[in-house]
Amino acid sequence: MSSLIPIVIEQTSRGERSYDIYSRLLKDRIIFLGTSIDDQVANAVTAQLLFLESDDPDKEINMYINSSGGITSAGLAIYDTMQHIKPKVNTYAIGMAASMAAVLLAGGTGTRYALPHARILIHQPWVKGGIGGQVTDIEITAKELLHTKEKLAEIIAKHTGQPLEKVKEDSERDRWMSAEEAKAYGLVDVVVQPRERKKA
């Protein structure tokens, strides 16, 4: 898999230096979240956010998101770190920001962007696989899931300005949005238009 990650070679005063593409982007304060969110991904993104704050607490961070979502607790670790650190975090939806990734997109503390063909999805959290065990344990798990559902709706309402009840209603089923619809909803601030190219 690592052979699929491009390497960038730069000339320095000490000679050539090679970086994997993600490390090179990080040097420019760019974090790329381009996979589903699990604990390992959350740890890497959180570490990058903390490193960039340590490097320069007054300089903005740009996070590009192309993700189908993932584990809620892992996503909330990234979200809480974004809210905690001093640098503003600008978020960009490219391709898709679905489920937990849409929460991260909306939770940008700087400007929140969507590229023109990005698709954004909000919905309620869902559980993979079956839930088993004693009835009391299943009841405890169900209460925790309902608490998580409520918390995610509150986060989306906070960042979009939408009434909590509307967010809950809209999240009952998959709610896909175009970049423009996401802007109207309050998930993003700006739909990025293509750069003008000079004609030869």
UniProtKB/Swiss-Prot annotation:
Keywords carried by this UniProt record: Cytoplasm, Hydrolase, Protease, Serine protease
One annotated GO molecular function: ATP-dependent peptidase activity
Subcellular location: Cytoplasm
Catalytic residues in the record: S99, H123
PROSITE patterns: CLP_PROTEASE_HIS, CLP_PROTEASE_SER
EC number per UniProt: 3.4.21.92
GO cellular component terms given for this protein: cytoplasm; endopeptidase Clp complex
Signal peptide boundaries: none
Domain of life of the organism encoding this protein: Bacteria
CDD domains, sorted: S14_ClpP_2
Gene3D superfamilies (alphabetical): 2-enoyl-CoA Hydratase, Chain A, domain 1 (3.90.226.10)
BP GO terms, sorted: protein quality control for misfolded or incompletely synthesized proteins
Enzyme class: hydrolase
Catalytic activity of the protein: Hydrolysis of proteins to small peptides in the presence of ATP and magnesium. alpha-casein is the usual test substrate. In the absence of ATP, only oligopeptides shorter than five residues are hydrolyzed (such as succinyl-Leu-Tyr-|-NHMec, and Leu-Tyr-Leu-|-Tyr-Trp, in which cleavage of the -Tyr-|-Leu- and -Tyr-|-Trp bonds also occurs)
Family: Belongs to the peptidase S14 family.
Subunit-structure text: Fourteen ClpP subunits assemble into 2 heptameric rings which stack back to back to give a disk-like structure with a central cavity, resembling the structure of eukaryotic proteasomes.
Free-text function comment from the UniProt entry: Cleaves peptides in various proteins in a process that requires ATP hydrolysis. Has a chymotrypsin-like activity. Plays a major role in the degradation of misfolded proteins.
Protein name (database record): ATP-dependent Clp protease proteolytic subunit 2
Species of the source: Symbiobacterium thermophilum (strain DSM 24528 / JCM 14929 / IAM 14863 / T)
Lineage of the species this protein comes from: Bacteria, Bacillati, Bacillota, Clostridia, Eubacteriales
